[in-house]
Amino acid sequence: MKHPSSLFSALLTLFFLLGATSLPAGITHGPALGRPGSDTMSVWARTSESGTFHVTYGLGPQALDQTSEIAQTQLDHDNTGVVTLQGLTPAMRYYYRVVTPDGHQSEVGTFRTWPSAEWARNAEYNPKGLFNYKFEFACGNNPKPESSAGHPMATYQTLFDRKVADEVDFAILNGDWLYEEKRDYPVESWIRQMRIDDADVPGFVRQCPSVTGLWENYKTFWDRSPNLRDWHRRVPTFYTIDDHEIINDVFGTNTPGYRNRRPVFRDIAVRGWIDYLAWSNPQRHEVPAYFGKARLRAGIDLLEDFEADFTKMPWKDMANLHVHWGGQLAGVMDPEQPIESADPNFGVYRIEEVIDANTLRLDRPLPTTSVSSYSIGRRAYGSFEIANTEFFILDTRSHRDLHDIDNPSREDLSILGRQQMDWLLDGLTNSEAEFLFIVSSVNFMVPHIGSGGGVDKVDDIKKDDAWTVFLHDREKLIEHADSLGKQVFVLTGDLHNSFAIKITDRVWEFASGPHNSINHSPPLDEGNRPANGPFLYGPRPCEIKWSTYAMPDIPRLSRRFPQYCIVSVNNVFNQPRNLGAENRWVAWERPYVMFQFYNGLTGELNYVETIHAAEQVMKGLPVE
């Protein structure tokens, strides 16, 4: 006998497919939390029809006595929307639920606001108002049985069993929240699901039909795991984009002349990623990608779009130009049959010149005459501060040159693109934080040169996803970070293993995960690195202090060793004057950060690394 909730879901899906129009608009996905702060929190939800919702919230699950502003859900964003709660009290536990105009309600969720400097300040012992906080980070949420630990996503159950959701102030999902599935979901099925007429289909969906498969991918993953849904309802999360959010093993998004289906799906993928996840992220550039229809002529290097005004575009806030592969299947990972591009002019282009409002000069002549779907990408990276720390959330996929694994030190190739790299270096230099976190979806010191025992998906370039094939960028960043006199932590994902690596006395790499994906095998996939000890891959030696490790003789589907990491930033300790008195926060002379790695199946503590802030002036009395 089917579980009642499964039966209801099946009947509801059937009702959608039959084109039902009598169901009221309701909440289909969410709520999820993001954009946390000491006096603010944002709430995301998706509705069955485009419309509105609001949030009721308060200090108890039965005392939701405050009401948010109205959020709008929009059809061209798959009926997703976000509302921000403001004027909240620091370090306070709240409860909330999403409500639609017809009274449809979500389950009750809960969150805790961040502390504030005023909340923690003590004029004598903590004049800066520092406070402690924790976050969880990992990568790799793959739920597909053929390449993961399966649908239940046991790590999230462990996180709840260990009450991690109640302890952490936020989480970082460091890439690969999504894995490709249902990417062939057709526009016609989406129309029925949305209960709209053909005339109501947004122009964006007509122009980029593969987006409906991407949206369905997100909804499928959300539907599949109650543990995952519960986590996002309780823990505000930041995200990096990695290859599976676009297409597995995506390279060369910034290399003019590169013609491959994977990179030119970038802008459609980033749009869906922001619709469902990265709405939560801080953004240095708020300008969205531009999607248009271009007239292209054979042998001519001009692009014409009579709906655009290129003279008014904020070019410093935008990325390069892609002519799309086209068609419904542009975003699938492994099509059952080879698929031909719907557009002979597809590829990566550089904009050389704005000729006039409707005309761009590109880096090369077009091979054929066509009317083509194209986009000019967005820049999806940013930073945020909390206490005495600053986080820089990178995009290692959207502005990435096509690497040269035989010449990894080439100065003309970049993993971030020059603009993002300059932003990062300037941000590190000008930051007033004591601890700096660089959040990179791909690994820093360990190569990613294998596919976990699977088959490489790109046959026109040798695989390496990591910074190890962009050594000029990596060494420049390490030297710059090491010169700052602060502790700098590079948080990484992508490789399905966890490790702690000391690069210099002040620069470290910590990789965490996977939450649910099959582990890679270091001898096959990671440059034959050791489980711990000295390691050299490229010009710079490092020390692997600890790692997870899957021996190559373990069958692929038996490599199920999920991990997660809790990071504790410790700035103060509590010293009330008397037992039961109010908190009195006293600042440590040298604050410290603890990286604690746990087994995702059992919650067993595997490893701890504690790192103190840079040396301070010696205190104490001389001994005669």
Language-model regions: role of each:
Residues 9-19:
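Bacterial N-terminal signal peptides
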Residues 23-83, 87-624:
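Long, structured stretches of catalytic cores involved in phosphate-ester chemistry, encompassing
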Residues 1-11, 377:
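Bacterial N-terminal signal peptides that target proteins for export
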Residues 4-8, 21, 67:
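Intrinsically disordered, low-complexity segments enriched in Ser/Pro/Gly/Ala and basic residues
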